[in-house]
Design a protein with these regions (language model features):
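A short helix->loop->beta-strand "cap" motif at the edges of active sites that frequently abuts
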Residues: 27-28, 260-264, 309
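Redox- and metal-dependent alpha/beta enzyme cores, enriched for Fe-S-associated oxidoreductases
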Residues: 248-287
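Extreme N-terminal starter segment of soluble prokaryotic enzymes
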Residues: 1-3
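Long, intrinsically disordered low-complexity tandem-repeat segments
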Residues: 149-178
Length: 352
């Protein structure tokens, strides 16, 4: 059996622990296609938060308290940067984590594509699944917010290290909005998703998400091939708006999923009307989707009607969920330990 998982970072990484354990039970192969929309360049280094969260979690090196970064992390470099007044102070890189970014950036600068760099990094961590970035190309999630003077300050935009490329975002192709060609119009501006999420805690007046580079991005080698050869495609219980949608925005990925032979089963990230973790409710509000299992299921839609899903696994609290032309099943979805997560994965695979 071949299993493909479309996934984001922290929640998706925990889900993949269960997928890996299930795969070992049944002798399956697993490929994880990971979101890169959160990626940014910081202090000259390429940082891939979701890829690293998955790699560290599956490799046994993730911090269980924070849910991100490395266990036993230290912050000497962060403190030294702060002493120099280097921005951004709101996004810290731990000393151990920095080693990953240094190796990644060195390899990228030497000409290696991201999927090969990821494979090389994974040789240390032995995640037990194949990790693929959704694309090797530039793809960043930017957020269109109401303009505020503090957002335009050098500190907020990280000086020369900022990843907000307003000239690119200002094009109609990048924003799918002709008004954006003139500085977004109506007092709007773009900031990187990480600034919106980490610094501002998703509290700014927000208009939409833009996946910069998606139209030109190509799937990383192996992505569409894995989907075409899969026996089942699972959509992890990751943030639908900013973890799963950027993957599907890469040209050719959505088509590979919707036209491929494998059944597509999604797992709801919403239990009883609330996110399992994080601020997915705020992201869903930006895209006009109700924070519920039904809302997310309808966002993905039925494959038979041009959407993604053949099956939708929801929590027992949401057993009455109905998605037209999609098989809906309820099961315990709290990933309290590996056994619970394996049972959840098994329930999803059995829907295929």
């Amino acid at each position: 059996m071949r299993i493909v998982v479309l996934t984001g970072g922290i929640g998706g990484a925990r889900f993949l622990l269960g997928v890996r354990a299930y795969a070992q039970e049944v002798g399956a192969e697993v490929t994880a296609v990971v979101n890169v929309g959160d990626d940014l360049r910081l202090h000259g280094l390429r940082v891939c938060p979701d890829l690293d969260s998955v790699m560290y979690t599956l490799g046994g090196g993730a911090d269980p308290e924070r849910g991100w970064g490395r266990t036993g992390e230290t912050w000497t470099v962060k403190d030294e940067l702060a002493a120099y007044g280097a921005e951004p102070g709101w996004f810290g890189l731990g000393d151990k984590d920095l080693a990953t970014h240094l190796v990644r950036t060195t390899m990228l600068d030497a000409g290696y594509p991201l999927h090969q760099v990821t494979e090389a990094l994974a040789t240390r961590w032995q995640p037990g699944v194949r990790l693929l970035p959704a694309t090797n190309d530039r793809l960043e999630t930017h957020v269109i917010v109401s303009a505020r003077s503090e957002l335009a300050s050098p500190a907020a935009t990280n000086n020369a290290s900022t990843v907000s490329a307003r000239s690119e975002l200002a094009s109609p192709a990048a924003t799918n909005n002709a008004a954006a060609a003139d500085g977004f119009g109506g007092g709007q501006q773009a900031i990187h998703f990480q600034e919106w999420w980490v610094r501002h805690r998703a509290q700014l007046p927000t208009h939409r998400f833009v996946f910069v580079g998606a139209e030109a991005a190509k799937p990383a080698p192996g992505v569409t091939e894995a989907i075409a050869e899969a026996d089942v495609v699972l959509i992890a219980p990751s943030n639908p708006a900013v973890s799963i949608t950027p993957i599907l925005a890469v040209a050719g990925v959505r088509e590979a999923v919707t036209t491929g032979p494998a059944p597509v089963v999604g797992v709801s990230p919403i239990i009883g009307g609330a996110p399992v973790r994080g601020m997915a409710d705020r992201c869903l509000a930006v895209v006009g989707v109700e924070c519920s299992a039904a809302g997310v299921g309808q966002l993905y839609g039925a494959r038979a009607a041009g959407g993604l899903l053949d099956g939708w696994l929801v929590a027992e609290e949401d057993a009455q969920t109905v998605i037209p032309q999609v098989t809906v099943r309820a099961a315990p979805l709290r990933m309290t330990d590996e056994a619970a997560t394996v049972a959840m994965v098994r329930a999803a695979v059995e829907m295929a």
